[in-house]
A protein has these predicted regions:
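Retroviral integrase
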Residues: 1-96, 146-203
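Charged, gly/pro-enriched flexible loop segments at helix/strand junctions
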Residues: 103-171, 198-203
Length: 203
């Protein structure tokens, strides 16, 4: 599921085991816990949800949940996804950038997940967007508006670039061997992204 904040334009992909109302609400809570701002009453600043006419959004359960949270729900007409413009435009941009990364690296379609996640989490949020400005009227980025901090790009790497991983230890049956003094203590791989909840790189 792709969620896009209307104010900052910051996007976030969430995998879903089941396409249900409960699963959707759970992902919305996850998005708010990361990017939402708490007002003076201790409430999340979610006021409106604009989405397509999927059954998980048109269900009575979802509508009741929105009413309970005092969230205004707007549904796009069936077969008219252009009414859900913000998400559709963002999705096209993410898809275009992701495919460009794959074409540049010459990797097959099985890597599309890594390309989409890297684009969504690390490339799109740090790029200025047309007509996106801060309170002073200056151009800004989705990450800056969403978090209030200047985005860092020093940790970013070229996606799908060749990498060498240092192997400090090796596990043989029940033993852990120190590889520091061995002739070959590293191996080659491909950089495919950055972990979400820890430092380092995915290879």
């Amino acid at each position: 599921m792709l969620i896009v904040d209307a104010y900052s334009k910051i996007p976030k992909f969430y995998g879903m085991e089941n396409i249900t109302t409960a699963e959707v609400m759970d992902k919305l809570d996850m998005f708010q816990s990361r990017f939402g701002k708490i007002d003076q009453l201790g409430c999340w600043g979610l006021e409106r949800i604009s989405t397509d006419a999927g059954t998980q959004f048109t269900s009575t359960e979802f509508k009741e949940e929105c009413q309970t949270r005092r969230v205004h729900l707007t549904l796009a007409a069936p077969e008219h996804q252009e009414m859900n413009g913000q998400v559709e435009v963002t999705w096209r941009t993410l898809r275009t950038v992701a495919h460009a990364l794959m074409v540049h690296a010459g990797v097959p379609e099985v890597y599309v997940h890594f390309a989409l996640m890297y684009t969504t989490d690390h490339i799109f949020p740090v790029l200025p967007i047309k007509d996106l400005i801060n309170e002073d009227g200056d151009p800004t980025t989705p990450n800056k508006l969403a978090t209030g901090t200047k985005p860092s790009v020093s940790h970013l790497r070229v996606l799908f670039s060749p990498s060498v991983v240092k192997k400090a230890t090796a596990h043989v049956e029940t033993q852990t061997l120190n590889m520091r003094h061995q002739a070959q203590n590293d191996f080659r791989g491909i950089f495919v992204g950055i972990p979400q909840h820890q430092k380092g790189y995915l290879v």
